[in-house]
Structures are given as C-alpha cells and as structure tokens.
C-alpha cells in the first residue's frame, strides 16, 4: 500500500485541481507543485482572485452572461446593435464570439441545448425569456449560433417554431469549410453543408 507523500491539505488541492476540465491527476499534481513553488507570485493572487469571484460574480438577468454586475457589461453597452440577438448554448460560446469580434449585437445564453437522452428539455433552458426578448420592437433578427450537432440543430428548430409569431428574422451561423481548412481533411457532412451554403465570389 503506497504511503502518503504529502499532507491532506495538499492532497485536497490536487484533488480539486483534477476536477478542472483538461486536468487529470498527473497534470493536477504538476499544477499544484507549480502553485506551491510560486506561492507569492501566483498562489496568493490566485486565491485572492477566486475569493473575489465567489463574492462578486453574477449571472446577467438579461442575457445569462457571467460578469461582476447584472445587467452585464455587454447588455449595458449603448454602442451595441439592439436589433440583433445572438443565441448561444453556453457562456463559453458567447466569449468565443466576443474574442472573434464576430458581432456587435446582444446575446442570449440558453444554458444548454435540448437533449432528450440527457434529460434536458425546454423547461431547463431560458427559451421563454428569449421569446419575450424577441417581441421587443427593437429586435429585428435572432441569430442561432448553436453547435452543428443533433442537439444543437434540434434546439434551433424548436426555437424557430416558437418564434413564428414574433416579427423577427431567424438566421443561423453558416456551416462549412473553416478558414485555412483543407478539403480532404473535412468530413462529408461539413463538405455537403459548405456546398449547399456557397456564396458569390
């Protein structure tokens, strides 16, 4: 039976780090050692930042983004285009679109996508709030920026049906060849979607 190498406090730190996405037990052990070695430069500021996050992080009451205030920084930005709402499944998707500078509209975070196999139904998403926002007379377009998966497309169709009575245009992200992508590395579904959604050159 192996003996304990460290005290329970350090083992607890390693176990908690191992719960983070992309970190297994070995990576968590390396991360813990790095934090301990850089206690003043990294561990103390990280602990402080985590405490601030615990105390101040809020979920935006309007769009579902994570920020230190509600409504969030995006929802209170007067420079944004109020005619566009971009619907995403998760906050990570919102952040990815923001990093890309892909839109100047507002967002709506569903919280997930419909997934009957995982027990996620319409009642588990913020779809009712989205429908209410779509009836705002300033809103002209709802962009469905959902993953090109079965669950993502099911969710997109469900939302499109619900928005039938709202006076808005419903669009979705184009699917196809990524920038820098080579055709022979793409799957058949991606190539088919790219061909169907081709545009003028």
Swiss-Prot record:
This is Recombination protein RecR. It comes from the Bacteria. The lineage of its organism: Bacteria, Pseudomonadati, Pseudomonadota, Alphaproteobacteria, Hyphomicrobiales. Gene3D superfamilies: 3.40.1360.10, 6.10.250.240, RecR Domain 1. SUPFAM superfamilies: Recombination protein RecR. Belongs to the RecR family. May play a role in DNA repair. It seems to be involved in an RecBC-independent recombinational process of DNA repair. It may act with RecF and RecO. It holds the Pfam family RecR_ZnF. Residues 83-178 form the Toprim domain. NCBIfam families: recR. PANTHER family: RECOMBINATION PROTEIN RECR. The gene is recR. GO terms for molecular function: DNA binding; zinc ion binding. HAMAP family: RecR (MF_00017). A zinc finger (C4-type) spans 60-75. GO terms for biological process: DNA recombination; DNA repair. InterPro entries: DNA_Rcmb_RecR (IPR000093), Rcmb_RecR (IPR023627), Rcmb_RecR_Znf (IPR015967), TOPRIM_dom (IPR006171), TOPRIM_RecR (IPR034137). Keywords: DNA damage, DNA recombination, DNA repair, Metal-binding, Zinc, Zinc-finger. SMART domains: TOPRIM (SM00493).
């Amino acid at each position: 039976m192996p003996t304990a190498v460290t005290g329970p406090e350090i083992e607890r730190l390693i176990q908690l780090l191992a719960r983070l996405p992309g970190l297994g037990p070995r990576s968590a052990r390396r991360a813990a050692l790095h934090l301990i070695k850089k206690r003043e430069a990294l561990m103390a500021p990280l602990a402080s930042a985590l405490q601030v996050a615990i105390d101040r992080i809020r979920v935006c009451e309007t769009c579902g983004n994570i920020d230190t205030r509600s409504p969030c920084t995006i929802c209170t930005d007067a420079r944004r285009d109020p005619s566009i709402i971009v619907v995403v499944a998760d906050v990570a998707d919102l952040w990815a679109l923001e990093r890309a500078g892909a839109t100047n509209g507002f967002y709506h975070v569903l919280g997930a996508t419909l997934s009957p196999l995982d027990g996620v139904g319409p009642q588990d998403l913020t779809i009712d709030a989205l429908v209410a926002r779509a009836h705002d007379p300033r809103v002209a377009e709802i962009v469905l920026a959902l993953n090109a998966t079965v669950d993502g497309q099911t969710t997109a169709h469900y939302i499109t049906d619900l928005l039938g009575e709202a006076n808005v245009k419903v669009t979705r992200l184009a699917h196809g060849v990524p920038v820098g992508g080579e055709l022979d590395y793409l799957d058949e579904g991606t190539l088919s979607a790219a061909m169907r959604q081709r545009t003028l050159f």
